[in-house]
Amino acid sequence: MFLSLTLAFFSACRQDVEIEEEQNTINISEEERNNALSFLALGDSYSVGEGLEGEQNWPERLFDSIKKNEDTIKIIAETGFSTNELIQAIDNVVLEKRYNLISIQIGVNDQFRGNSTELFKQDFQKLVQRIKENEFTKWASVFVLSIPDWGATPFGSSWDRIRVTNEIDTFNRIIKGVCNTNNILYIDITQLSRSDPNNWIFVTGDGLHPSSLMYGLWLDKITPLVKGLLK
């Protein structure tokens, strides 16, 4: 049971995608940028909604609350993604439209695997730079969610919770610093993830990943901030 939960935490699927050899420069008018919402969510299991059925993850639910008729959403995320693996996934996906809203929630697997803070900062900065340089994403409003504290879950009870909490806080400080440098909205949901560490109503059946109820708490905080970002 323990092994299967651990593997589920950081194992990732891989999909072969056709890579476009040439990408032409795109001229984007102000009118196009202000048109329909196109939302790109980047992340790991927290953006996937691991353990939940249907479209119960927080990006889909956020999109449902702000979308209009012609709006679209795309999620590039896999359970187990580290920041570097997310960068590789973005590089290997052929984006076919311009996005004007992008979310990032990444880093828990960097912490879980014991990656150094120096490497994580380097990779997170690289991720932000990719978004700023890509013709399909550079016009977007970007927001970043902090890393939840997986130590504050029933699964985390068998780990050193104090150590996990301290490491999560350190990684989140790095994320916040990069966001401040790049004028990106940073949304702290970590404290919400620590609401009740032993309560199973806040996690899925694996005792680790957020339940629909926990995502709802996140969205209560995220939604008004994102609506403000889009004004």
Which role fits each region the language model picked out?
Residues M1-T6:
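Sec-dependent N-terminal signal peptides
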Residues F9-A12:
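C-terminal motif of bacterial Sec signal peptides marking the signal peptidase cleavage site
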Residues D16-V17, L230:
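Membrane-interfacial segments
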Residues V17-T79, A89-E96:
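Serine-esterase "nucleophile elbow" of acetyl-processing enzymes
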Residues Y46, G80-S82, D149, S193:
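Residue-level detector of flexible, active-site-proximal loop/helix-junction positions
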Residues E78-S82, R163-V164:
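Short, flexible loop segments at the rims of nucleotide/cofactor-binding pockets, characterized by
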Residues Q88-K231:
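Alpha-helical cap/lid subdomain in secreted, periplasmic
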